[in-house]
């Protein structure tokens, strides 16, 4: 699992991870749970299982390509290079095809994504990868196609 150190695991996240772990063939788990989560693989909310879909072999090749590219780690002054690296070397090459994707807002953009297995509670830090001491409360309604159940307006 990859998480930012300033976020905490939630019941919602645990339920989504458990659902992914029950799949037999998808090496990557991607979670997008906020309107700001607009890219395929966020640096703060993904996981991998090396035993699924040749995950170990795919990651080995990914790391080899990354280390051969002098640009991969050249610019450390910008925010978010981890996400750019994940998009280029993992998501676009093999991660998208070998993933379970939980998505609350962009399920139509990310084909094959599914809604979260739990309904969002209206409380502080109520989305995956929330910064724990911000106390943000996400109240935005999610689009109907992203809802696991039609009556879950805060999915």
Residue ranges and their predicted role:
Residues 34-155:
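Catalytic core and acceptor-binding pocket of nucleotide-sugar-dependent glycosyltransferases
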Residues 5-7, 90:
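Short, flexible loop/turn elements at secondary-structure junctions
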Residues 7-42:
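Conserved donor-nucleotide/metal-binding helix-loop-beta segment in metal-dependent transferases, i.e.
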